[in-house]
């Protein structure tokens, strides 16, 4: 009887190498195919854009950076004068260089620059909206979680409500409420808060559904009610993650409140839109720089605070459980 020779280690290695090379060639082929389809889709979208703009899309491409050249002022010092509401030597009697026009006098000759006040309003809108969104999400998330809900039929309703709240962009909701409540920060607060409840609620209940259920089972065994089980069995495990998500949402809401200001939500976004529409280059650049510095500072601070919260998770769990 003829015995079949068993494959040697070198034969097995060659087979693995050949299979790996074949897989690499297949992946490379799929990658090039994907890039080709993406390139065709890009060309098709450019053709559609040119056709939709009556053939002027490609004609206007050389003027793509005209806005940047308009934004750069002839005198760079006017940017700082506009930011601090200091008189400009180029003042010609119009609002373009009349920077002290927006001063907000607090006491005597002490004033807050107009754009700084508007930036504070924008941050306050984001902060208040985040707090309202956090409170609303906290009220709904444990009901929406599969492992903690007291009534499963109520869980379905709550999840649908949160899906509805986050289905519409903040700017759409803000435009609706601005038409109802008039222009101002109130419309922005309502719009961002509603969207924040839906977004944070989804993140929160997904965290809750992955907690360790042993503490909850122990509390249930001694006859604890649902609120007590949530307080001592659920919250200690999820609060660090909740705080991390809230701080991340605060970063998003600062940017959202700026954008919403352009549709009547007040704050610095509304002033930025007016400066661009009126052709005030120095004021526009001052607002852009202030926005960049502020959003960068908020992002860095919230990222640092998130790292501290997640790093001290054991300490927070111990403090909440007491």
Question: Can you say where each PLM-predicted feature lies in the sequence?
Answer:
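A structural signal for multi-pass alpha-helical bundles of membrane permease subunits
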Residues: 44-51, 174-181, 296
């Amino acid at each position: 009887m003829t015995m079949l020779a068993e494959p040697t280690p070198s034969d097995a290695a060659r087979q693995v190498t050949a299979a790996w090379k074949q897989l690499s060639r297949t992946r490379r082929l799929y990658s090039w195919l994907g890039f080709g389809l993406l390139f065709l889709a890009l060309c098709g979208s450019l053709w559609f854009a040119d056709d939709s703009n009556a053939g002027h899309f490609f004609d206007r491409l050389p003027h793509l950076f005209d806005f940047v050249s308009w934004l750069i002022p002839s005198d760079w010092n006017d940017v700082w004068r506009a930011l601090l509401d200091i008189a400009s030597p180029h003042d010609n009697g119009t609002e373009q260089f009349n920077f002290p026009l927006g001063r907000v006098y607090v006491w005597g000759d002490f004033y807050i620059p107009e754009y700084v006040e508007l930036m504070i309003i924008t941050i306050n809108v984001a902060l208040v909206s985040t707090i309202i969104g956090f409170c609303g999400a906290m009220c709904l998330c444990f009901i929406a979680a599969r492992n903690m809900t007291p009534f499963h039929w109520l869980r379905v309703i709550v999840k649908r409500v949160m899906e509805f709240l986050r289905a519409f962009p903040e700017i759409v909701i803000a435009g609706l409420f601005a038409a109802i409540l008039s222009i101002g920060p109130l419309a922005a607060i309502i719009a961002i808060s509603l969207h924040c409840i839906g977004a944070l609620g989804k993140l929160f209940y997904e965290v809750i559904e992955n907690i360790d259920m042993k503490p909850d089972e122990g509390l249930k065994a001694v006859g604890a009610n649902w609120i007590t089980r949530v307080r001592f069995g659920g919250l200690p495990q999820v609060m660090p993650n909740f705080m991390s998500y809230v701080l991340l949402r605060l970063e998003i809401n600062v940017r959202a409140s700026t954008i919403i200001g352009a549709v009547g939500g007040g704050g610095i976004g509304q002033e930025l839109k007016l400066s661009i529409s009126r052709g005030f280059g120095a004021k526009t650049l001052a607002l852009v720089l202030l926005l960049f510095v502020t959003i960068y500072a908020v992002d860095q601070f919230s990222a640092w605070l998130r790292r501290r919260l997640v790093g001290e998770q054991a300490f927070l769990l111990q403090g909440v459980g007491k």
